[in-house]
Amino acid sequence: MTLFVLCGLQIFAASAKKDFTWGNATVYFVITDRFCNGDTLNDINYGRRVDYGSERLNAATFHGGDFKGMLAKAKEGYFTSMGIDVVWMTDVYEQIHGWMTGSGPVNDFPHYGYHGYYPLDYTQIDKNYGTVAEFRELVDTLHAQGIRVMLGANLNDPGYPTLLDAVQYGFAETGYTAEEAAQHIREWSYDKFFEKRLEWNGWYGRGWVRMPDEGWDENNPLEATLYGMPDFKDESNETVKIPAFLQRKWKMEGKKNDAWVNPSARKLRKNRDWSPSQYLIAWIASWVEEFGIDGFRCDIVENVRINRWQELNAACNAALGKWRAAHPADPASAWTDKFYMTGDYDCASIDYKPDYAAAGFSSLVNFYFPKHGDLDGIVYTWQAYADSVAAHNNWHPFNYLNNSYHRDADMDNMIDCGTALLLSPGVAQVFYGDETGRKLTEARLNVDSDQAFRSDMDWNDINKEQLAHFRKLGKIRRANPVIGTGRQRTIDTHTCVRYDGSDKILLRLLPNEWQPITVAGEFADGTKVMELYTEQTAVVKDGKVSFPKYEHNVAVIKACKDTEK
């Protein structure tokens, strides 16, 4: 038994010394509002309603998740127990106050910006998530655990103008009071009231967003008003003033919102000789400067001109350098990796995109990662991914099973799905609840069923076997960066080796107790090896190795340091 323990300690201690690499990162993507409610006192703000009487109607209201709740889970070790390297939180910026028509013109539920995709004010935190002090404590805690922090960045569009925002900031005449505007008015149509009219001029204004009367090409992704949202004029180099409604908003708030205003953004609330994109980039980069944010997932990448992404990347790298220099006592100040950028590019796979790499992207989200959990063919998919990693320096796949727009994975086979993901080359992104069996809600019956994919994390209904599996493989992955960044030799349909110099791991899928695993050419006879998932050891004999048992259709084999040959 002592030998087994020593072997395991040697393997994990040696691996733990290796530096973090984004190419092997395990990213935990969490919708803050749906994860954990740590403070019920911040659940209702800005005149919003949170309860319309049924689960279907409440599908897209704010549900109470916040920084305090996430901090509590971080302190419990929830993320470190899964080997998480990066926590990706949905955007923390203040969201539109009112609701948008759910399912578009159908309007079968009120749709709020709980998910962070509908920004109103980039200079302060949404009160539903928590305060600046609470966010700082969360980021600092994650950094102290060796975990990077990602947020979202969107240069394409602000949030929708809504009835409630129009009433509160007076940019359009609605005929409603604030209380009435917060009701779910089924007969109200965004398409008729805002999208085709010029009230946008009172929202962000003609200099900032494309107006319906300007004749833009709706078939051109760089000009289209995506899902009817106002579209920033990212091609414009014309100087603009900060939108009048924002100036009015800040004047109305005075110092009342100081607990939520990003200190590094306060100086950016003045008119400059800037284009719309310059304001946006400065506002977004200020979160890096203030909190040491380590990366961004950029939204709808192909809808924004590449030069703007390049400018954002440069601004964020400068801001991160400034933060590290200003916080020498913070463990994250010693990190040397550059600011990380990935993004959603519609239907992207693992293909290398040199223009985006030159703009500062290290990956684009891989929409085509297999989500069925079929372990009979995944080795060949892994081979293609590993070959791509080897061919393109600092570019790697960003793989996922589920995300906020898709629940494509076989939820009845998440053990094998988790194996396919967590042993894949490149980034492995776990969507909150993938590891626990988080269930859908009645919102799946709405026309816009996406809201059902974003259900609340139910901490009283955890699939313990599934969670244990994600934890085991996640920790193995974190301790062995070669899994994500190494080259691959495929031996057969179920067996491959990841290697980087002398660092080597053999992966065997669907192993059988009665069938020895062939390791000839990888581990010499007499080498003591450990199967990391079950922590069993064995000695290689006649080019083969056997273990008394296997669990969950996987074996991860590595040589013990004291007998490597």
Label each residue range with its predicted role:
Residues 23-27, 80-87, 143-150, 291-296, ...:
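Loop/turn elements at helix/coil->beta-strand transitions in domains of secreted/extracellular proteins
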Residues 30, 79, 89, 122, ...:
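Conserved, mostly hydrophobic/aromatic
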Residues 23, 44-48, 95-116, 155-249, ...:
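Aromatic- and acidic-residue-enriched segments that line the glycan-binding/catalytic groove
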Residues 14-148, 156-158, 163-166, 187, ...:
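N-terminal structural segment of carbohydrate-active enzymes
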Residues 66-78, 272-290, 413-418:
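Short, acidic/polar
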Residues 34, 85-97, 152-162, 300-305, ...:
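Short, solvent-exposed turn/loop segments enriched in Gly/Ser/Thr/Pro and often Arg
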Residues 53-68, 116-131, 228-277, 294-303, ...:
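The substrate-binding groove and active-site-proximal loops of carbohydrate-active enzymes
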Residues 186-192, 197, 282-400, 411-412, ...:
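Active-site-proximal helices and loops of the catalytic beta/alpha 8
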